[in-house]
UniProtKB/Swiss-Prot annotation:
It comes from the Bacteria. One of its GO terms (biological process) is maturation of SSU-rRNA. Its main location: cytoplasm. One of several proteins that assist in the late maturation steps of the functional core of the 30S ribosomal subunit. Associates with free 30S ribosomal subunits (but not with 30S subunits that are part of 70S ribosomes or polysomes). Required for efficient processing of 16S rRNA. May interact with the 5'-terminal helix region of 16S rRNA. This is Ribosome-binding factor A.
Length: 133
């Protein structure tokens, strides 16, 4: 019987909390000054690598998002050193930051579904008169 949550998932969950605190309190880079949320962390099985997925409050501006990700990549060594102090791990994983567009895509899909439902309701209330010809 497989474990429901293995060690990589537990470490990723704790790391997500710690990175969020570090970004909130320690990172002073103005490129990351916009509200940054850590939406997820994926760990490799050997806990040596971590993919950190982030979203930004001001994510409509693509240039700002790219600059934010670049700033996080440049600060990854500093973030990694703070993680080493906050968490007791034999190997502090190498961090790679990615922009998580799943929230934006989810909102877009939700809007599409809402529009289709609204259009369908309008068709039911006002059937086309052209069918009587």
């Amino acid at each position: 019987m497989a474990k429901e949550f293995g060690r990589p998932q537990r470490v990723a969950q704790e790391m997500q909390k710690e990175i969020a605190l570090i970004l909130q309190r320690e990172i002073k880079d103005p490129r990351v000054g916009m509200m940054t949320t850590v939406s997820g962390v994926e760990m490799s099985r050997d806990l040596a690598y971590a993919k950190v997925f982030v979203t930004f409050l001001n994510d409509q501006d693509e240039a700002a998002v790219k600059n934010g990700i670049k700033a996080l990549q440049e600060a990854s060594g500093f973030i990694r050193s703070l993680l080493g102090k906050a968490m007791r791990l034999r190997i502090v994983p190498e961090l790679t930051f990615f922009y998580d567009n799943s929230l934006v895509e989810g909102m877009r899909m939700s809007n599409l579904v809402t529009n289709v439902v609204k259009h369908d309701e309008e068709r039911r209330v006002n059937p086309d008169d052209s069918k009587e010809d």
